[in-house]
Amino acid sequence: MLQVQPGPDSISIVAAEDARTQRDFLHLPERIYAGDPAWIAPLLIEQKQRVFQNKPLFAHCAVAAWVAYRDGAPVGRITAQLDTLQPPEADGTIGYFGMIEAVDDEAVFAALIETAQDWLRARGAARMRGPYNLTINEEIGLLVENFDTPPFLMMGHARPYYDTRLAEQGLDGIK
């Protein structure tokens, strides 16, 4: 467990390796998107198999998932992926983050991004891109406009503050 911010309002980042944290990881979007008529809930069994039981992907791709907690309640989540089949680019190996969901709090986003970056760097990644949920063949990118319409198939949904919170962490959008 990584304790990010000391004190009563502390943020803890916990690897989603047991039943409780995996359940929190899977159900967190329900909290983030409560009351959002444009959000379509994913199939939980599919999400669980994809993130925690995806044996073919795991044969060549290292994947880690974390949940951010504040005062015992889940407030964010993220994954990091490093695919050994992807050749390095001219400026080094690229790692990916994805499945990021969090409350509107800069400290939570900072803790999640830092955790993913540290994990990727420890495995040799020179840079990080995302969000990729979990590969380029799944949902990629970040919704930055038209938040009032449901996503198309294989497209993610986000709250309007995600773009700002990720930019605060030095992550710039590309088109």
Model-derived regions, located:
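Glycine-rich phosphate/pyrophosphate-binding loop shared by adenosine-nucleotide-utilizing enzymes
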Residues: 73-77, 95
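A short helix-loop-beta-strand connector motif used in the catalytic cores of GNAT acetyltransferases and
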Residues: 51-67, 76
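Short amphipathic alpha-helix that is part of the acyltransferase structural core
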Residues: 2-53, 93
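Acyl-donor binding region in acyl/amide transferases
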Residues: 88-172
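A short acidic/small-residue loop/turn micro-motif
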Residues: 82-84
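Proline-centered turn/helix-capping motifs that create local helix->coil transitions or kinks
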Residues: 37, 170-175
